[in-house]
Amino acid sequence: MNKSRTLLNSAIVLYFVICLEILIMISPFAGFFYSAFNPVLLGLAKYPETRWLSSFFFTHLLVPPNDFLKFIRIMGSVLFVLGMVVFLICALQVYASKFFKTGPALKGLYSRIRHPQYLSLAVAGIGLAILWPRFLVVILWISMVFVYYLLARDEERRMQKQHPETYPEYIKTTGMLLPKRVEDAIHFSTGGGKAAAFIVVAALAVGGAFLLRDYTVHHLPVWAESNIVALPIVPGDQGMLEFRMADILQVP
């Protein structure tokens, strides 16, 4: 039980850290937060090996400049809302089963996947990473996925002890985090398959973030002259920016 509580607390802390900067940025305490948190970001930026962690890989204060990037931004909101809604539905199902003492939740999404609540939180985490796109958030998301896997394993051990008549058979017919057919195809049930799946997920997350940053940078409507670089908040203001910047630079 202590191990379960530790894993659960770790997952909660990771999700809280991911959400924290977003919540504070829309609050009146943004200045205070950055005065306290800025040394951490500066510490990361101090060394070439960790500098990338504090940087952004997608627009967050600017309107995305093209339809593809706008679609990515919208999908961030969709994934976050969808993940949280599915999580709440799954949580309601689990607690209803406990309240009415009907045994483990085996219907709905649980009839295909044993831990849809963790999968839905991971999906919501992808949405959060798009809405507040620091590389550090991506690394925290990868860590969170690993903690969810440990939670799922610990939960299954406890459920097999509590429901030895139904849960072992349930495990044979369902997947842990993906439909059983998918997990069988990637050999997820083996230790090597799990390790390979985690490495692939981590590589896709970090590599995808770098690719998105490269694409975003190459499509930003940048105005530059000498050592001055400017960006319009709204892409439609690029013409005004080009027209006015020459006059602005003449102001003493």
Locate each region found by the language model.
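Membrane-anchoring alpha-helices and their flanking helix-loop junctions
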Residues: 1-106, 119-246, 250-252
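Alpha-helical architecture
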Residues: 81, 112-113
